[in-house]
């Protein structure tokens, strides 16, 4: 067992103690049934929204997946340049602004200022090019200031640490204590905490993915990870729709 694993285990135990988590073993089915019916009862109560998944802001998607639910690990795959980051930031913005959730965004590709500009652009309905050039009309300045005021009141946290590992993300989230949604952009830029896998990228990605799924369950939150898809699907005859095998 390496030092990173020991540190991660120790931090997890401290985190569990702070939350008063009772580490149970086997649990009889009748107890789980009672808990399940209790959850269903809460879902039908007047304040049911707090027990439902975090809304993405896309009605059709929310109706299909019932929002982003606790312990879910969601892998969002698309080819380069298809708008993965914009899509994920829209989810983050909606969760923070409309649902008043705490959102942590780990960006391994873009810096914090770039992410902030994108969030402001979307909230203010001002083109991203104008934010890059600074050539803004007076009404656009007004909308940007209003957007900045709205976003400043949210609990969106940005981290642009390059080549971050799963244990490092977990450590930062534990220090944050209260977090409702984690977004990672993107999976292939993360580093493995296990040196034994160095040089074997397939094993590294597999270990990182498994670690993120475990993290979602341990912290009891949804984790949305973006992933690049290989361009091989474009070369396939007939159906160009991406498949699981296109995850690289």
Label every PLM stretch briefly:
Residues 74-75, 104:
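Short hydrophobic/aromatic beta-strand immediately N-terminal to the Walker A/P-loop
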Residues 50, 128-138, 156-162, 192-206, ...:
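Flexible beta-alpha connector loops of hexameric P-loop NTPases
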Residues 1-70, 126, 140-155, 167, ...:
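Core recognition of P-loop NTPase motor domains used across DNA-transaction enzymes
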Residues 63, 94-178, 192:
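Cytosolic-facing regulatory segments adjacent to core modules
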Residues 203-248:
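Phosphate-binding/switch region of NTP-binding enzymes
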Residues 78:
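The Walker A (P-loop) glycine that initiates the GxxxxGKT/S ATP-binding motif of P-loop NTPases
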Residues 81:
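Walker A (P-loop) phosphate-binding loop of P-loop NTPases
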Residues 84:
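Conserved lysine of the Walker
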């Amino acid at each position: 067992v390496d030092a990173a694993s020991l540190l991660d285990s120790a931090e997890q135990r401290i985190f569990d103690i702070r939350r008063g988590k009772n580490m149970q073993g086997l649990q009889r089915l009748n107890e789980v049934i009672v808990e399940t019916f209790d959850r269903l009862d809460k879902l039908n109560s007047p304040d049911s929204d707090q027990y439902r998944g975090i809304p993405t802001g896309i009605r059709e998607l929310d109706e299909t997946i019932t929002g982003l639910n606790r312990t879910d690990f969601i892998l969002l795959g698309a080819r380069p340049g298809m708008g993965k980051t914009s899509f994920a930031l829209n989810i983050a913005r909606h969760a923070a602004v409309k649902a008043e959730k705490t959102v942590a965004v780990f960006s391994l590709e873009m810096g914090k200022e770039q992410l902030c500009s994108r969030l402001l652009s979307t909230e203010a309905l001002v083109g991203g090019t104008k934010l890059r050039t600074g050539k803004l009309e007076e009404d656009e300045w007004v909308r940007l200031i209003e957007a900045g005021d709205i976003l400043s009141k949210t609990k969106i946290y940005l981290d642009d640490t390059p080549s971050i590992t799963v244990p490092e993300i977990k450590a930062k989230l534990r220090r944050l204590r209260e977090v409702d949604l984690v977004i990672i952009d993107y999976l292939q830029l993360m580093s493995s905490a296990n040196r034994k896998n160095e040089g074997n990228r397939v094993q590294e990605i597999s270990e990182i993915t498994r670690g993120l799924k475990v993290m979602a369950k341990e912290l009891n939150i949804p984790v949305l990870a973006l992933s690049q898809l290989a361009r091989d699907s474009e070369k396939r005859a007939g159906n160009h729709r991406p498949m699981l095998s296109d995850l690289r």
